[in-house]
């Protein structure tokens, strides 16, 4: 069998902070892979085994966006009036990833290279976090949201999933992801 540990973080509205907490806890364990599964992502447990078998540094499973593409749903319902309503999302769902430029077609059941993918169903090898810590040792902070085990506001943790506010664009106040690219 495969030894597993489940970690849950409740009442945390900042996704980047929650992911940093969970990554920090993961790095204090002896496990080799970390798997993010958001509460609203449906999956088959065999999907986890399939992701593990791909042996990639970072690999994600496709899952639908939270919004529905009503135009595609209406078109599919017209073309396939006998289709069970519960099957519609499998056919018309828009997924949380962007394929690399030049990709003409794909299926969500086969591995494909992507430019970006949501972290709501993502597996990351330990070595990815360790490499980021090694390459960018200064990107650390003291969590201000105390109350979780190991997070009492005294210790620094790494900001693997960091977000900053663009203070130069005060008209929008949008949050911009701060992404660090590195190669192995």
Regions found by a protein language model. Give the residues of each.
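Acidic donor-binding loop at a coil-to-helix junction in glycosyltransferase catalytic cores
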Residues: 144-148, 173-181
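Active-site neighborhoods of divalent-metal-dependent phosphate/nucleic-acid chemistry enzymes
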Residues: 162-175
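Short beta-strand-to-loop acidic/aromatic patch adjacent to the donor-nucleotide binding site
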Residues: 29-44
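Conserved catalytic core of nucleotide-sugar-dependent glycosyltransferases
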Residues: 23, 44-164
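A short, glycine-/small-residue-rich helix N-cap motif at loop->alpha-helix starts
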Residues: 13-18
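Short, acidic, metal-binding catalytic loop of nucleotide-sugar glycosyltransferases
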Residues: 1-3
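Phosphate-handling catalytic cores of nucleic-acid transaction enzymes
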Residues: 26
């Amino acid at each position: 069998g495969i030894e597993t540990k489940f970690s849950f973080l409740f009442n945390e509205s900042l996704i980047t902070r929650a992911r940093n907490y969970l990554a920090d806890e993961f790095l204090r364990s002896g496990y080799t892979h970390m798997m993010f599964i958001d509460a609203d992502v449906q999956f088959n447990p065999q999907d986890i085994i399939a992701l593990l078998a791909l042996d990639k540094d970072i690999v994600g499973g496709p899952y639908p966006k939270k919004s529905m593409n009503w135009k595609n749903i209406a078109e599919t319902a017209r073309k396939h009036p006998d289709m069970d309503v519960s099957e519609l999302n499998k056919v018309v769902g828009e997924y949380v990833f962007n394929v690399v430029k030049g990709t003409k077609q794909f299926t969500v059941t086969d591995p494909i290279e992507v430019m970006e993918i949501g972290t709501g169903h993502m597996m990351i090898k330990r070595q990815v976090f360790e490499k980021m810590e090694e390459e960018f040792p200064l990107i650390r902070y003291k969590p201000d949201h105390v109350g979780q085990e190991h997070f009492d506001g005294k210790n620094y943790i790494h900001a693997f999933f960091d977000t900053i506010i663009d203070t130069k664009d005060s008209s929008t106040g949008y949050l911009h992801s701060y992404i660090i690219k590195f190669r192995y």
